[in-house]
């Protein structure tokens, strides 16, 4: 195994200028990530200088067999923490050969919203809290839980320390460092309320980059859990009963909200979000009704509410924002399996472009 390890960790730059680019895209379910690699003649830092590529869309449920070619458009580059050196990860979106975005390409419409002059002028910032659950591969039962049984009730696990409270920290820390290496703006990690559940935060990131960074961070997490022989689940309620679900709380601010007097603008933005509650819920992730029950730090899926420091509300405003009269707010409705392109762009569209 040592020779295999040595070969995996070969430093290509010592013998060749060529690099490996791992092209990554979202598959037909809207949540499954796919990737494949190609050799390039030398280092690349600008996605516009990367070649387009194609793949068999009939094998990802994105095209029929008789017309299966789907085109990959490179959109964002990150350093590859697995191959290291000058090798890169490339976030792509997907198009037909005629240049039409596929239905699963949520980045295309998000980019249009973020490039709108009224949105771009407000420099929207996002901080996304991505929760996930680590599962034992052979049983699909949370890591650290007894097979067919349950751990002690929730309470000691949130930000917990110790072998009886924190399950999978090696995976979490490996992911944290790999994201920092890659150039993702990951801002922290913590153990969550349900044992075996964790969270990482990305941001503040501007506009479309928030979605690119979340998808890249998810890809890196999937690869690390693959190596560890563990399954990562983004299901919003992986275990029924008296256990917390998994969300992707999305923190948001605009230039106007961050300036003096911004609290009044925040309140107007939240009011607009309330008026479009049903539309947002429909776009905020599959299975969210199992999570948004009014229990376990959520509000009921059919009810919109907001409050200061209230983790049982749809939207939470922090004490500091209220005190300073400016800042940001947190949309607590998105589920852990949400598409970050959809959620971030929809919040911007509703608060900056939509007229009631």
From Swiss-Prot:
The lineage of its organism: Eukaryota, Viridiplantae, Streptophyta, Embryophyta, Tracheophyta. It holds the Pfam family Gln-synt_C. GO terms for cellular component: cytoplasm. SUPFAM superfamilies: Glutamine synthetase, N-terminal domain, Glutamine synthetase/guanido kinase. Signal peptide: none annotated. It catalyses: L-glutamate + NH4(+) + ATP = L-glutamine + ADP + phosphate + H(+). Keywords: ATP-binding, Cytoplasm, Ligase, Nitrogen fixation, Nucleotide-binding. Residues 106-356 form the GS catalytic domain. One of its GO terms (biological process) is glutamine biosynthetic process. This is Glutamine synthetase nodule isozyme. Residues 19-99 form the GS beta-grasp domain. Coiled coil: none annotated. It comes from the Eukaryota. Homooctamer.
